[in-house]
Regions:
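A short, Lys/Arg-rich alpha-helix, primarily the initiator
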Residues: 1-16
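Short C-terminal boundary/hinge segments that cap the last helix of small helical domains
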Residues: 56-68
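The alpha-helix within a helix-turn-helix
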Residues: 11, 22, 52
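Short alpha-helical DNA-recognition segment
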Residues: 16-34
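Short, basic-rich loop-to-helix N-cap that marks the start of a DNA-contacting helix
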Residues: 39-50
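Residues within the helices of the helix-turn-helix
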Residues: 8, 19, 49
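DNA major-groove recognition helix of helix-turn-helix
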Residues: 36, 47, 66
Length: 68
């Protein structure tokens, strides 16, 4: 089982850079980069909520599931 964060796709669709998102959310660029590159082992609901609010999307838009 593999769950992926599709932040890169959403950012491209919205025309937003990771740096802009970092500034808007008050999150570090390093933490957002970890999410964007799928190196995160977990994500807090508060982070998911903030991303959804800022990017005007649903949690399912930011996450994808693929079977191994």
């Amino acid at each position: 089982m593999a769950i992926y964060v599709t932040l890169n796709r959403i950012l491209e669709q919205r025309g937003v850079t990771l740096t802009e998102l970092s500034d808007r959310l008050g999150m570090t660029l390093a933490n957002l980069s970890i999410l964007k590159t799928n190196k995160a082992r977990a994500i807090r609901f508060s982070t998911l909520d903030a991303l959804c609010r800022e990017l005007d999307c649903e949690p399912g838009d930011l996450l994808a599931y693929e079977e191994d």
